[in-house]
């Protein structure tokens, strides 16, 4: 595998390797190795990021790679250079891998056509996909629950604008999860792999094994999709009271950033969620992805083990 642009780029072997390797890293998070020594990884983020960018940088450095993060606000794009020329110039410097985030859906897939021999990771493109976040959530759920098959997973919030929702639905439904999406009618879209659509929040989370919350992406909203944050919170915020309708061992997830008091109460975020565990798993999973893309010999040798 040369690139990770979409969840469907991964087959079952790819996912199993990433899961097994990620859990090894997760259980040995204080242990560094030099599996990527001598590799150069460029982070090229055209959209703001805290967790994803930091997670990739920490993952790469802990594996011995050299990282270069391009500050787009001070790059030659401010002098009129096009995005494609920026990417082509960076690629001409022969980095081993480029990690790209863009506000434009499908942009990274289009860019990849100009870079057939370069390793590329999609760190999120518009509302299209965020494959590494879906892998993090998959690994987190499987780590805690021991499986994905037949779990009732409720994804709640701004489905319409969410790349995380799309990638998660594609991945988790492949492994047999029963996925419900829960949102106002104006924030819903038809997605393959969804079992149920709910506009009533309590109905949507009833009997859930996993509740995955998503923030309102106001920066992507071009039409009048909600009347107010206050009304949205009244109808769709997960709080102490409505959490009781889910299963007693439910896990509450959020890819971040959270808007406490809107989609999740302070109490649930701080006392009942596994948000920080997801962040920790994020470093482990991204280590595994980097190794899978860049350590070809390691993967080949593992594939020959009988």
UniProtKB/Swiss-Prot annotation:
Pfam families hit by this protein: OTCace, OTCace_N
Enzymatic class: transferase
Coiled-coil regions, chain positions: none
Enzyme nomenclature, EC number: 2.1.3.2
Reactions catalysed: carbamoyl phosphate + L-aspartate = N-carbamoyl-L-aspartate + phosphate + H(+)
Positions contributing to L-aspartate binding: 79, 163, 215
Protein's GO biological process: 'de novo' pyrimidine nucleobase biosynthetic process; 'de novo' UMP biosynthetic process; amino acid metabolic process
One cellular component (GO) term of this entry: cytosol
InterPro entries (UniProt xref): Asp/Orn_carbamoyltranf_P-bd, Asp/Orn_carbamoylTrfase, Asp/Orn_carbamoylTrfase_sf, Asp_carbamoyltransf, Asp_carbamoyltransf_Asp/Orn-bd
Pathway(s) annotated for this protein in UniProt: Pyrimidine metabolism; UMP biosynthesis via de novo pathway; (S)-dihydroorotate from bicarbonate: step 2/3
Residue sites binding carbamoyl phosphate per the record: 51-52, 101, 130, 133, 256-257
Keywords: Pyrimidine biosynthesis, Transferase
A GO molecular-function annotation: amino acid binding
Family the entry assigns: Belongs to the aspartate/ornithine carbamoyltransferase superfamily. ATCase family.
Quaternary structure annotation from Swiss-Prot or TrEMBL: Heterododecamer (2C3:3R2) of six catalytic PyrB chains organized as two trimers (C3), and six regulatory PyrI chains organized as three dimers (R2).
PANTHER family hit by this protein: ASPARTATE CARBAMOYLTRANSFERASE (PTHR45753:SF6), ORNITHINE CARBAMOYLTRANSFERASE, MITOCHONDRIAL (PTHR45753)
Physiological role: Catalyzes the condensation of carbamoyl phosphate and aspartate to form carbamoyl aspartate and inorganic phosphate, the committed step in the de novo pyrimidine nucleotide biosynthesis pathway.
Protein name per UniProt: Aspartate carbamoyltransferase catalytic subunit
Organism (species): Ehrlichia ruminantium (strain Welgevonden)
């Amino acid at each position: 595998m040369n690139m990770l642009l979409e969840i469907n780029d991964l087959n079952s072997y790819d996912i199993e390797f990433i899961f097994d390797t990620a859990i090894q890293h997760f259980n040995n998070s204080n242990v560094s190795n030099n599996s990527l020594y001598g590799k150069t990884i460029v982070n090229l983020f055209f959209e703001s990021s805290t967790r994803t960018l930091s997670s990739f940088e920490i993952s790469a450095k802990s594996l011995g790679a050299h990282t270069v993060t391009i500050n787009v606000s001070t790059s030659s794009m401010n002098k009129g250079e096009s995005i494609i020329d920026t990417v082509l110039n960076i690629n001409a410097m022969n980095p081993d891998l480029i990690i790209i985030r863009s506000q434009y859906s499908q942009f990274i897939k289009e860019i990849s056509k100009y870079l057939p021999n370069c390793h590329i990771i999609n760190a999120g493109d518009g509302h299209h996909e965020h494959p590494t976040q879906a892998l993090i959530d998959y690994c987190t759920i499987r780590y805690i629950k021991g499986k994905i098959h037949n779990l009732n997973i409720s994804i709640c919030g701004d489905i319409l604008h969410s790349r995380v929702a799309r990638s998660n639905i594609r991945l988790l439904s492949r492994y047999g999860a029963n996925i419900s999406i829960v949102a106002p009618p104006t924030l819903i879209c038809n997605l393959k792999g969804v079992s149920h659509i709910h506009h009533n929040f309590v109905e949507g989370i009833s009997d859930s094994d996993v509740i995955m919350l998503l923030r309102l992406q106001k920066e992507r909203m071009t039409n009048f999709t909600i009347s107010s944050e206050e009304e949205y919170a009244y109808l769709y915020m997960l709080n102490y009271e409505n959490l009781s309708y889910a299963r007693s061992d439910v896990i509450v997830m959020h890819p971040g950033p959270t808007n406490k008091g809107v989609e999740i109460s302070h109490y649930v975020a701080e006392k009942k969620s596994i948000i920080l565990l997801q962040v920790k798993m994020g470093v482990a999973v991204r280590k595994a992805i980097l190794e899978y893309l860049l350590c070809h010999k390691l993967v080949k040798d593992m594939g020959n083990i009988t």
